[in-house]
Amino acid sequence: MEDERQVELDCISAIFPEIVLDPNEPFTATIDLPVNPRNPVKVYFPASADGAIQTPLHTPPRSVASGHEDGQGVADHANNVESHNLSYLPSLQLHIILPEGYPATYAPKFELATSPAWLSREYLDELQANGECMWEEADHSEIVFGYIDSLQQAAENAFGYGEGKVLEIPQEYKIALLDYDIKATQAAFEKETFDCGVCLGKTACMRALYLTNIY
């Protein structure tokens, strides 16, 4: 009889072709979940007066300097805070381990990370714990798809940071995050095409920028 874990992983692989199964560790897989919020997220990069890097804050909403809607950085000199609106944040890395006895006896093990660490370890631990809660609520049945789906839904609003929560990240990560946002935005832009009545064909966005007949 085929192992339930293998059946579930086969189904997950069919739904998410990008998932990577570990050839050396049976019933283990990894998937990167994109974080492309519905609305740009304002990210603050604070620095102390002496230039020292501050630790990230993941707190309820509070009053901070606002940034421009075009994604350009804004410096709040009074509070020594620089802000940027980002449309893309580094993906959430999910490592899945289905132990022997899953799903009937043991819960799946989920390990989460981001690189760079723009989400706090404390918050990632909370997300990981949600997986076991889902397994308990599902009466010890298969929940890998449901867990991935819950993370994808949370990513749509940047795990709450797209809805007013303040996201502060150390200056040491600023270049990496801005570079990621620029490259991801460019990649998404290049995938788009337009129907051109003059060229009589589809024209990629990068080229369409220079066509005055595109409206």
Q: Language model features by range: what are they?
A:
Residues M1-D22:
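Eukaryotic proteins' extreme N-terminal regulatory segments
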Residues E2-Q6, N85-Y88, W118-E122, A138-F145, ...:
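Intrinsic disorder
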Residues V7, N24-T28, L89-S91, T105, ...:
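Eukaryote-biased feature marking scaffold/signaling PDZ-domain proteins and nuclear chromatin regulators
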Residues I15-E18, D22, E100, A104, ...:
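Short amphipathic alpha-helical interaction elements and helix-loop-helix interfaces
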Residues L21-E136:
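Compact alpha/beta protein-protein interaction domains typified by the UBC
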Residues E25-D32, E111, V144, I148, ...:
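Short amphipathic alpha-helical segments embedded in low-complexity Lys/Glu-rich regions
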Residues N130-G164:
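Acidic, low-complexity intrinsically disordered segments
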Residues A154-N213:
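Proximal pre-RING flanking segment of RING-type E3 ubiquitin ligases
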